[in-house]
Amino acid sequence: PELLENGMNFTSVIVKLNESVEASGIFLEDLQNDISHFLEHYHLKCLFAEKRVQYLVHHIYGRNALSPTTLSAVGSYISRQYDTCGKHLIAAGNTVTDIFRVYQSYASAVILLQNCFFFPEKTFLTENSIRLLSPKGPVPDFLQSPENTFSKYLLAGEEEPCFQFLDELFRYYSCNHT
């Protein structure tokens, strides 16, 4: 392995596979080779770690910090590589300088990964993409206690209001980062 120099920039990208998918070692090795080859065009490299089969962590690094455009291209490419695995979530952490701070990038990617559930599958979330979203505003009164409202409709056997309420709940929380 090559020596990592001081001042290297790192960005952690985490892919969470669907629970029912288990990627084989050979598949992952081929995938890592493809990603490494792609990253060479940007003068970047990758340290790969697999966590509990479902969480695939790519620590992307190089001398220069990734621009938002480069990060978007890298994230899109990595996401496409996992298309054969079916549904997956993907997020990138903040860029940090020096290897001893990589955990900070990883931790910020984990936090963003938690938000992926509110976005369409395969949406590549970054701090920048979240920042560009307009806030949804305060929770409407009728969504303040969703469990009470939903159980009221459910217990009354009111099918149409149940579906309308769930649609409203989905609309409010879909792509909502707040």
What do the predicted segments below correspond to?
Residues 1-178:
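Hydrophobic, helix-rich cores of sensory/ligand-binding and other regulatory modules
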